[in-house]
A protein has these predicted regions:
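Short boundary/hinge segments that flank catalytic cores
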Residues: 42-179, 185-204, 208-215, 220-224, ...
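Hydrophobic residues at beta-strand termini and immediately following loops
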Residues: 29, 89, 233
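Inter-motif core of Ras-like GTPase G domains
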Residues: 257-260, 274-295
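Non-transmembrane alpha-helical coiled-coil
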Residues: 1-36
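Switch II (G3) loop of P-loop NTPases
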Residues: 204-207, 232-277
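Conserved acidic residues
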Residues: 45, 231, 263, 286, ...
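Structural beta-sheet core signal
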Residues: 182, 232, 267, 290, ...
Length: 349
């Protein structure tokens, strides 16, 4: 016990000496301070990072989207083509048409075709101005060949807007008192026939012999809610054998007769890559207007149109670019969803 006591006493003395030594060599260099504000997170840094990310993410998305977009977007995509360029029509959505969010998502990659007459006498919006330019170019092209009065409208893709263009171009000419006949040659779809209410009798009924006189299926413009000098032949009954029906001699006879009665005969044909009807109409036509839809046709398909032109598969072929979204370009401003641009002068059209 004595030894244990001496051991503990020794340890106590050593501990006292150690405490005295440590206290002697320790001193406060900087007194401790405190702050009511947190050290982290720093709000300024967070806002700076958020601003940078908010700027960079949209830029990256736009860059990727633009580089992944392989469709025709404007006139510059057609600059290397050999096909004569007739004109362009800007993208247009009716004031009455208000697409829902679901419709905008559904048709994001495939623009909705406007199925209405936008050309009207005296209107000064950007679309009417574009059709005036198109009409002027068309008349200038036809001017040296006045006998070329039968024109077909076609495209590579469905939904290119050729029916809409053919109808409004016909209206533009009719306002100038040119007699124009628009024939709905798409015996499977019949978009143009909607202009006259899609009646039950039309071109197919004449070609199969059920209607003897072509004038019985001819709808006068002033009687159909259009204008004078603008007449329409609808498709009538949709036949089970459209292509075979076109081989009848009555088709050539009808076109020859209408050529004598009208200044221009427009034929709205199906897309050439869908059915074989268009080459049949082309035999009796003088000119071909090819419609390219901006945002729909792939740029990789443009050489196919050039090949058709070089190989002379279609007579006197020209091209129209439809649905261009102009932003500060030749038409002055972007046009869409009911926005109009007015000029300070008037037209009788």
């Amino acid at each position: 016990k004595e030894s244990l006591y001496l051991f503990l006493l020794q340890k106590r003395e050593e501990n006292e000496l150690s405490k005295a030594f440590t206290a002697y060599n320790t001193r406060i260099i900087t007194p401790p301070t405190g702050d009511n504000k947190p050290v982290a997170p720093v709000r300024r840094n967070i806002m700076l990072v958020a601003f940078v990310l908010g700027f960079l993410i949209p830029v990256v998305i736009i860059f990727v989207r633009e580089n992944m977009n392989t469709t025709v977007r404007g006139r510059k995509d057609l600059k290397n083509m050999n096909v004569p360029f007739l004109g362009e029509i800007p993208y247009y959505v009716s004031r009455k048409y208000r697409p829902t969010l679901e419709q905008r998502i559904r048709f994001w990659k495939k623009p909705k075709e406007v199925r209405q007459m936008v050309v009207k006498a005296g209107k000064r919006d950007i679309v009417n101005e574009a059709f005036r330019v198109l009409r002027t170019n068309f008349e200038f092209t036809i001017g040296t060949h006045p006998e070329q009065t039968v024109i077909i409208f076609t495209s590579l893709n469905p939904g290119s807007g050729k029916s809409h263009l053919a109808a409004n171009m016909a209206m533009s000419l009719a306002i100038k008192k040119k007699k124009v006949l628009l024939i709905d040659g798409d015996l499977r779809h019949g978009s143009t026939s909607m202009l006259v209410g899609n009646p039950g009798e039309g071109l197919s009924d004449y070609l199969n012999g059920r209607i003897a006189d072509i004038h019985d299926i001819l709808h006068k413009g002033e009687e159909s809610g259009l204008v004078k000098y603008f007449d329409v032949i609808p498709i009538g009954t949709i036949p089970p054998n459209p292509t075979e029906l076109l081989f009848t001699p009555l088709l050539e006879q009808m076109i020859r007769q209408m050529r004598q009665e009208y200044d221009y005969v427009f034929i709205d044909c199906p897309p050439i890559e869908v059915v074989a009807d268009t080459p049949i109409y082309e035999q009796f036509a003088d000119r071909t207007i090819f419609v390219v839809r901006s945002g729909l046709m792939e740029r990789s398909m443009l050489p196919e149109i050039d090949a058709l032109y070089k190989e002379k598969k279609f007579k006197n072929m020209t091209m129209i670019l439809n649905g261009t979204k102009t932003r500060g370009g030749r038409y002055g401003s972007h046009y869409g969803y009911g926005y109009g641009y007015g000029y300070g002068y008037g037209y009788n059209y």
